[in-house]
């Protein structure tokens, strides 16, 4: 009997259609439930320590600018308005030089974010004065701690500018200057009275006798900054002594007091740099004086120039010092800035940073 070969069974078209229909239905169901088979959207990067300081200083600057503008729009006296205008203009410059508000280009996850606490409380002169004091203290602490030396120099300059604005606003309004609010950093920063005390040693290469170890090699940047500041103070001390000799009795006493203050500060920074009594000491026996010192205008301008030079060197010492050892240099910048203004210098938005000394045009 002939055998019958059975051919292999093949899927029927109807069965294939049913399977395909089921797959499509499953995909559509998943899509309807919000399931997406794709990569997640890019996340906002977490700011590092440097960006946190930069962003915080920018936010405070913008809040101060907005607060000063709001207060100035009310009924205030002309002297108060002049200071408020400087608060707004200086703070706008601060935010600009710091790079402004960070924008990652990603969609804002919280478009209705509330304003910062500082911005919400600046409604009058008293609140603005408190905000200036708090923000100056916070910037001082940030400048001391931030790892980036150039950002430290810039933030220190901003802190000193805010401190000077607070002094001016308190003076024209007759309001007492408040202490920083509880919880605001900066309470440990040296004040003007301690700016000439012994600064913190910048490096471990200094020996107990004030020199540097023979195998220390090239001076560390912190040592160079401290030595440059010692030189600026020494030149100021010498010039004030010359001015005292050329002054009347009424002015001679104040000139000699300034000379003594700068000489003490010079000695302190020289010891910090480890150059006292060594060939590396940059201080000199005498310094060049500007031509035409017999002209009263030239003689009156010299103290301003001397203090501004100390301020510039102080800002340089901030940048050269390691993080956590900058408070004395910041205090020196604050003192020199206040002294320059006392001798007739115009307030500037960036003390100690002559490269940013563009005059503000009303």
Model-identified regions with their sequence ranges:
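Sec-dependent N-terminal signal peptides
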Residues: 15-26
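All-alpha RGS (Regulator of G-protein Signaling) helical domain and cognate RGS-like helical scaffolds
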Residues: 2-5, 14, 34-362
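C-terminal motif of bacterial Sec signal peptides marking the signal peptidase cleavage site
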Residues: 28-32
């Amino acid at each position: 009997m002939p055998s019958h070969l059975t051919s292999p069974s093949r899927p029927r078209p109807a069965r294939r259609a049913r399977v395909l229909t089921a797959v499509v239905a499953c995909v559509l169901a998943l899509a309807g439930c919000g399931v997406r088979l794709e990569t997640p959207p890019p996340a906002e990067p977490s700011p590092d320590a440097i960006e946190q300081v930069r962003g915080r200083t920018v936010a405070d600057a913008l809040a101060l600018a907005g607060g000063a503008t709001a207060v100035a729009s009310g009924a205030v006296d002309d002297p108060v308005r002049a200071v408020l205008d400087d608060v707004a203009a200086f703070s706008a410059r601060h935010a600009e030089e710091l790079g402004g508000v960070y924008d990652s280009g990603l969609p804002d996850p919280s478009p209705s974010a509330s304003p910062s606490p500082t911005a919400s409380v600046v409604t009058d002169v008293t609140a603005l004065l408190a905000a200036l004091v708090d923000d100056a203290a916070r910037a001082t602490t940030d400048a001391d701690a931030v790892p980036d030396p150039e950002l430290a120099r810039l933030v220190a300059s901003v802190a000193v500018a805010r401190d000077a604005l607070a002094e001016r606003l308190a003076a024209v309004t007759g309001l007492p200057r408040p202490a920083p609010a509880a919880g605001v950093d900066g309470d440990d920063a040296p004040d003007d009275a301690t700016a000439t005390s012994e600064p913190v040693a910048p490096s471990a290469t200094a020996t107990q006798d004030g020199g540097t170890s023979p195998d220390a090699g090239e001076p560390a940047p912190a040592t160079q900054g401290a030595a440059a500041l010692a030189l600026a103070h020494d030149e100021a001390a010498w010039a004030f002594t010359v001015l005292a000799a050329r002054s009347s009795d009424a002015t001679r006493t104040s000139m000699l007091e300034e000379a003594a203050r700068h000489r003490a500060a010079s000695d302190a920074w020289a010891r910090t740099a480890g150059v006292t009594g060594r060939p590396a000491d940059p201080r000199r026996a005498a310094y060049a004086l500007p031509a035409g010192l017999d002209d009263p205008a030239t003689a009156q301008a010299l103290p301003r120039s001397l203090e501004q030079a100390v301020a510039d060197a102080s800002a340089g010492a901030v940048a050269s010092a390691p993080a956590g050892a900058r408070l004395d240099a910041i205090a020196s910048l604050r003192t020199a800035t206040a002294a320059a203004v006392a001798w007739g210098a115009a307030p500037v938005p960036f003390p100690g940073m002559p490269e940013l000394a563009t005059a503000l045009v009303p």
